Amino acid sequence: MLSTVHKAGRAPALLRHGRRVPVQASQLRALTSGAQNTSIFQTQANAAQRLSSQKRWLSASAAAAAASQPAPDAKAYIQSGVVKPRDHVDVKKVLVIGSGGLAIGQAGEFDYSGSQALKALKEAGVASVLINPNIATIQTNHSLADEVYYLPVTPEYVEYVIQREKPDGIFLSFGGQTALNLGVQMQKLGLFEKYGVKVLGTSVRTLELSEDRDLFAKALEEINIPIAKSFAVNTVDEALDAANKIGYPIIVRAAYALGGLGSGFANNEEELRNMAARSLTLSPQILVEKSLKGWKEVEYEVVRDANNNCITVCNMENFDPLGIHTGDSIVVAPSQTLSDEEYHMLRSAAIKIVRHLGVVGECNVQYALQPDGLDYRVIEVNARLSRSSALASKATGYPLAYTAAKIGLGHSLPELPNAVTKTTTANFEPSLDYIVTKIPRWDLSKFQHVKRDIGSAMKSVGEVMAIGRTFEESFQKAIRQVDPRFVGFQGDKFEDLDFELQNPTDRRWLAVGQAMLHENYSVDRVHELSKIDKWFLYKLQNIVDCQKEMQQLGSLEALKKEHILKAKKLGFSDKQIAMAVNSTEDLVRAARKGFGIRPWVKKIDTLAAEFPADTNYLYTTYNASSHDVTFEDKGTVILGSGVYRIGSSVEFDWCAVSATQALRAMGEKTVMINYNPETYSTDFDTADKLYFEELSYERVMDIYELESASGVVVSVGGQLPQNIALRLQETGKARVLGTDPRDIDRAEDRQKFSEILDSIGVDQPAWKELTSVEEAEKFAEEVGYPVLVRPSYVLSGAAMTVIRSKEDLKDKLEAAANVSPEHPVVITKFIEGAQEIDVDGVASEGNLILHAVSEHVEQAGVHSGDATLVLPPANLDQTTMDRVKEIAQKVAKAWRITGPFNMQIIKAEDPEGGLPALKVIECNLRASRSFPFVSKVLGVNFIDAATKALVGKNVPEPTDLMAVKRDYLATKVPQFSWTRLAGADPFLGVEMASTGEMACFGKDLVDAYWASLQSAMNFRVPEPGEGLLFGGDLSKSWLTTIVDYLSPLGYKLYAADNEVKQFLESSAKTKIDVEVIAFPTNDKRALREVFAKNNIRGVFNLAQARGKTVFDVDYVMRRNAVDFGVPLFMEPQTAMLFAQCMAEKLPRPEGIPSEVRRWSEFIGGKPL
């Protein structure tokens, strides 16, 4: 046996990430670590010795023997018979559990991992059945899953599907925490045993071990792996006792919780009392443990098969010290500040843990590491695919989810070829010759009263991943990817900079930038305040020094070639350089190209270029001297959606992937540009070439020019690609496919948009361009309040506000004008009580080809992304449908649309009984977030048709899909993440707040909505006999209608004051009793007791406006419903529809409900 030699000290920066050497061996055998004396992993035969400077794993003689071996060929190696394939799991049909709607803590990474699992099943010839109500995902296309059920991921509905489909296997590891919790519940109910369903991959017992904090602690104790001192408790008093034994500060963690939900730090008894009470409403058990704030946080991704082969695929290090959830941390892969000894100590421990727990598949191990010693603690183990797995997979090029699925089917690592490289087996640890940086994206500014601090509970809605050859290059790229308004490492004004550095918020890196760039803080001072490792801070100091050097030179003419090259190697963008020398981006670009400075294209091959590998997974860098690829394809560039944020999510990834697939089907070569590690579009086999790169004008033009591309698609990735479309065409002379960017501009600019609508005779609400406060006030008086204030070029209603008084108008004008100073602000008459209609369409050269008309359940005033959509519409008559189609045709012609487009129209009843007014309020000349929904409900892929129109090939004939009578309908409902956003007011308005969506089908509106709403995460239908709390606006009859539906079912009815009680009792159809309960708005603990004592399981709060303060009764009622995990209805139409559903659906009938049908059964085939 060979033993590992640990070297003290630190390796050079780019080499310090523990690359392993594949050892040549005649048969498989285990290696033993000298430090831990545990077997580490089995290696593959015939692998070549790494010929790099790292020889720490082999003696000189072994190195010489291995050097003579040829580069490995996976297939030949497997076929040689060295590896005896084990008996594969005998399953014919496998149920795959999806993760449901996107929420904070559980996002698009599960579309990517679930899709990989389905791909593995298809390759193995095993039938797949998917349950996932998230209609916007790629995995819910029939091209991946054989059968799809759009249903809630609950034991009840999954049992119905098992009864119908009779699967013999189930995958629980690819649907995040939702699938894991479901598996544990079903095991406890004995359902797997009852129906003879095998859990594939990691067993439920192991999942329970990793999730139940008490069992987990005991398991690690058995193998002498240190964890933080902790106690698992079930009550608040037990938590206080545990804290007294451990000593403050402590951290609270909830079991079976997603993304740190229900966790946080407590420095004293009062903080702990509140936190423990809140956490115990979200989870039956919490862990109270000693806080290790300030230690380093390090993660390892480990893969193990049932033969006990085990490899570490990637290790990652958090830029931020422990104390910030890894989902809210800046993360670097591979680790940069660990010594060789630290690296291997943690690696050995990870493998020991994974083997001991019996993980079969993929696992994530998180550590706290003492900054100045070899002491460590295990923080957490995720025995499933996670957000970190998606990041590790994209960072290394190792197909983790796909490999985990194959292992679940009984394959061993040595017998699996690596699907990316095609030259190595899956039993080969990746090595990286680049650095990856992940930065989260928050959207906290969209929420009123929200707390901006970041800690152990995750708040970010998305993340970016940047690749560079130096940390500086990678880091600056990532910053620009988070938000195009950022130019790179920069600062911002803070009231108390030292406080900001000590107490992390979502603006943490901006505080570091301000300190170093503008306030001359030293590295030592920033480290002292922030506890960020000095290695990272010295790298940031390099950026600061370079920027200051350019500022001193003062002009573009003074910059020599070496200055520009140095800046580019440190990740500076052309715009950033221009700002430093008072020039323009275009002039810097011209000067750079004049010096012959262009980016080099490199491959991610998982092998650090040591063996030949055939990958199409690319990035650009200035820290190189040659290209890894050739550029003969002249393909079509598709711009992806970028970072997930509120307003732009997995729906646009579905659109980008659908466009790519359509182009490839037509024989076109495709080039995808995107930087979001959570997406299917950034998977290795989606496009012919994948550039993991920024979606900036600079980078897109670099790639377009290098590739000599035939055109660029800007209409399938949401708003981000649209924003650079005109520049790509006018300045870059790129060929933009589809609608002319000048026409896009005529739709985005409110003034031009309105003038064109007037010219074609399409109605719109009265509006005026704003130039001064006085003019605005005058116009508002003329048309009458309420009015809508909005800037041009918005996504998801950013800075749009409904104004109801002159005072409000003055307050809001400044905020709106600040959003987009180049574009004027427009004021529009807001029509209350109107119905909103969504139109998704595809046109070719101004002619309408396809259109879909969805109606909103909510009245106008709720953002379309937060609205409940119904398709086909349940309440629109034929005359209205015909008029809507006519408007769509006129708009397509006026803007000469080629490709996808979306319109929002409001329908306002005529008080004199004439035809209702149809007024266009918005038009986007791109795909919208409802394209996947309408495509899947109508059974026609709108993006496929739009892509054919873009390239002018096989353009379909115009078809009126809305003329077809259907015996089903579907409802799309929003997924909110209020629980994660402490303090935020759960109130719907013109600014979008939802993070995801679900959709279900049914024979009618009640069927579909009933299933859709139960698909929301942790939603529980209040049962008859439980308590319901009412409050809000009493000027309308909404609350009465709800009470009339629900009171016969036997619910107990409560109100927070006498006024609501009297209103309900006097207006209800039958005699009812409403009890007034004490409602202390400033005492959360007392409120919790009120909710518990009265068994309140549902809250209906229909307020007309947001609470002005945090003591407003309606705000407190809404916020606490969310905090206590109680279903909240805060919008009148959906609340009344849900009450109708409860009246019709409760008590639940025997047998399988009518909504439990395959997608293909509803739509009559498998077209997508």
UniProtKB/Swiss-Prot annotation:
It comes from Neurospora crassa (strain ATCC 24698 / 74-OR23-1A / CBS 708.71 / DSM 1257 / FGSC 987). It is found in: Mitochondrion matrix. Large subunit of the arginine-specific carbamoyl phosphate synthase (CPSase). CPSase catalyzes the formation of carbamoyl phosphate from the ammonia moiety of glutamine, hydrogencarbonate, and phosphate donated by ATP, the first step of the arginine biosynthetic pathway. The large subunit (synthetase) binds the substrates ammonia (free or transferred from glutamine from the small subunit), hydrogencarbonate and ATP and carries out an ATP-coupled ligase reaction, activating hydrogencarbonate by forming carboxy phosphate which reacts with ammonia to form carbamoyl phosphate. ATP binds at residues 243-298, 780-837. This is Carbamoyl phosphate synthase arginine-specific large chain, mitochondrial. The large subunit is composed of 2 ATP-grasp domains that are involved in binding the 2 ATP molecules needed for carbamoyl phosphate synthesis. The N-terminal ATP-grasp domain (referred to as the carboxyphosphate synthetic component) catalyzes the ATP-dependent phosphorylation of hydrogencarbonate to carboxyphosphate and the subsequent nucleophilic attack by ammonia to form a carbamate intermediate. The C-terminal MGS-like domain is required for catalytic function. Mg(2+) 4 binds at residues 922, 924. Mn(2+) 2 binds at residues 380, 382. Mn(2+) 3 binds at residues 904, 922. Mn(2+) 1 binds at residues 366, 380.
